[in-house]
Amino acid sequence: MSFNSFGHLFRFTSWGESHGPALGAVVDGCPPGLELSEKDIQPFLDRRKPGSSRFTTQRREADAVKILSGVFEGRTTGTPISLMIENTDQRSRDYSNVAQQYRPAHGDFAYDAKYGLRDYRGGGRSSARETAARVAAGAVARLVISEVKIQGYLVELGGDKIDRQAFDEAEINNNPFFCPDKAAVARWEKIVDEARKDGNSVGAVVECVAFHVPAGWGAPLYAKLDSELAAACMGINAVKGVEIGDGFDAARSTGRDNADALRPADQGDRVKFLSNHAGGVTAGIATGQPVVVRCALKPTPSIVSPLPSINREGEAVEVVTKGRHDPCVGIRAVPVVEAMMALVLADQKLLHRAQTGR
């Protein structure tokens, strides 16, 4: 197994490298009869694509998606859907200096240890460029779960957190940080600008919420909804931690405070919860509350400041990373986390239907 695929019934396989001619995904298990065209996918890729602001990498890619199979007369056929995105702005020469050197905190040494060779051009398969394929596949998944609304945003950048009391969903797509707090945007601009001037980078925290997830999706024990979400998010480049609901704060709480009390429902609902510390999942199964996931992303190690390392011969060297890179990879990770949420939920919907008939 090469582990380039994700999912059970709704499954996708990503392919391609950062500096190859193209990359893409093959989505398998999509139900037939759904209306699908490139126009359904492109808006999500546009949110992720590079070069959209001075706060992201200046690599310019249109990220224009092409549907190669699985769609006939505008509808899915139930057969594999192949999606392709061409790479058009590679500068492989920028990486010639690291062909024989290992960049600290990158996959260089680990890939060499596993495979005995590596594509050093932009990190090859380990590049965040691969996440474009996930976003494309996630756009297809959203069609399967049209009843669910998914919204991601940044809640922290460079150690600076948003003011939860100032949360405004309308602000999220009005700034380059996907930030719901207007006052935080100005602070984050300064943080990223200063990091770039200093030849450095900063980390971030992405929060993603899925609304209207039906109670019952998920499974106990070894296929829990929250474990599937955690695996999906931990597979994203630069993610070093995942929380569901209150996450680690739950360990600092008490049973009385952390329990999401239930009350008789209002009209049309089975139950009303008085809080959502669990993040919409208990015992691995959705409760019908919003599903809340947070991902911590490390600062990119692709910085212009010299870092101590070794070469393939084991000799001490200092590595300087050239090329064009994000000063904060967490910014463009927002649509990626959304995509992985969609892919997991589409899979869980089909699994729930297969198991229960509902």
Curated annotation (Swiss-Prot):
Gene Ontology terms describing biological process: amino acid biosynthetic process; aromatic amino acid family biosynthetic process; chorismate biosynthetic process
Full protein name: Chorismate synthase
Role summary: This reaction introduces a second double bond into the aromatic ring system.
Membership in a protein family: Belongs to the chorismate synthase family.
InterPro entries: Chorismate_synth, Chorismate_synth_AroC_sf, Chorismate_synthase_CS
Pfam short name (any one): Chorismate_synt
Record-annotated membrane-spanning stretches: none
Alphabetical list of NCBIfam families matching this protein: aroC (TIGR00033), PRK05382.1 (NF003793)
Cofactor section: FMNH2
Pathway where this protein functions: Metabolic intermediate biosynthesis; chorismate biosynthesis; chorismate from D-erythrose 4-phosphate and phosphoenolpyruvate: step 7/7
PANTHER family, sorted: CHORISMATE SYNTHASE
Recorded catalytic activity of this chain's protein: 5-O-(1-carboxyvinyl)-3-phosphoshikimate = chorismate + phosphate
Keyword Nucleotide-binding found: no
Any single GO CC term annotated in Swiss-Prot or TrEMBL for this entry: cytosol
Keyword tags: Amino-acid biosynthesis, Aromatic amino acid biosynthesis, FAD, Flavoprotein, FMN, Lyase, NADP
Species the sequence originates in: Zymomonas mobilis subsp. mobilis (strain ATCC 31821 / ZM4 / CP4)
Binding site for NADP(+): 48, 54
Enzyme Commission number(s): 4.2.3.5
